[in-house]
Regions:
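Cytosolic catalytic domains that perform sulfur/thiol-centered chemistry
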Residues: 1-252
């Protein structure tokens, strides 16, 4: 492998441009948009993407046994889809999205849930890459199957019962990363059928407040999310839902 400097959670567009031809580097387009955004992630990928990028279908690579959307896929499904995308053991994976820094973080988390640590997010995503005039293409990559081994990290997931218990007893900090208006229930949820408001006791840290104007992560963003200092857990939560018929991994 020719990666000389070790990428961590975030890599810059300059880093990716310098390492894009490394044989063990794989790039993923993880674009996904809320219904009210009026964008089609797959169509945009087919029209233009970073050379060699594979498209990660967030709507399809999920737990199809659940009645809730975007639940984390079972390990065997994740492995099957990654092998079909030519991604496997020994690959350094860099993930980006078309909004700058939005859905790529979810796919990064999915890799980490499966025990894969050689994975990073492109800081600023596709908008920054294009703004800098870097190379793009509209051709699909050549895919070759590669073996992948995973080990699901169950400690990274809390189900609805655990979160409700923590909220009731105040045993953990529960962070809601949606915008303030959605947190306060002042606007309807973009997904139909969801109640407005937030989990009792949760705190609102809108993800957009952690970003710079160009969509890159603000100073100290990673440290803010990984360091609690008081021994408490910090959980990232999504929308409050109607009572589910099944508990499992946390939805987006």
């Amino acid at each position: 492998m020719t990666l000389t400097d070790d990428p961590k959670t975030l890599v810059s567009t300059a880093w990716l441009a310098a390492h894009r031809s490394d044989p063990d580097l794989r790039v993923i387009d993880a674009s996904w948009y809320l219904p009210d955004m009026g964008r089609n992630a797959k169509a945009e990928y087919q029209a233009a993407h970073i050379p060699g990028a594979r498209f990660f279908d967030i709507d399809e690579i999920t737990d199809s046994r659940s009645n809730l959307p975007h639940m984390a896929p079972p390990p065997e499904k994740f492995v099957s889809r990654m092998r079909a995308m030519g991604i496997g053991d020994g690959h350094q994976v860099v993930i980006y999205d078309g909004a700058g820094l939005f859905s790529a973080a979810r796919v990064w988390w999915t890799f980490r849930l499966m025990g894969k640590t050689d994975v990073a997010v492109l800081d600023g995503g596709f908008p920054k890459w294009r703004a800098e005039g870097r190379e793009i293409e509209d051709m699909p990559p050549i895919l070759r199957d590669r073996h992948m081994t995973v080990s699901r990290q169950n400690h990274l997931v809390k189900d609805v019962t655990q979160v409700a218990h923590a909220a009731k007893l105040g045993e953990a900090e529960i962070i809601d990363a949606r915008g303030a208006a959605r947190f306060k229930g002042e606007v309807p949820e973009p997904r139909p059928g969801l109640r407005s408001g937030h989990i009792p006791g949760s705190k609102n840290v809108p993800y957009a407040t952690l970003l710079n104007a160009d969509g890159t992560a603000g100073p100290g963003t990673c440290n803010n999310w990984t360091s609690s200092g008081d021994g408490s857990f910090r959980w990232l939560t999504g929308s409050p839902r109607r009572k589910p018929r099944r508990t499992g991994s946390a939805p987006s």
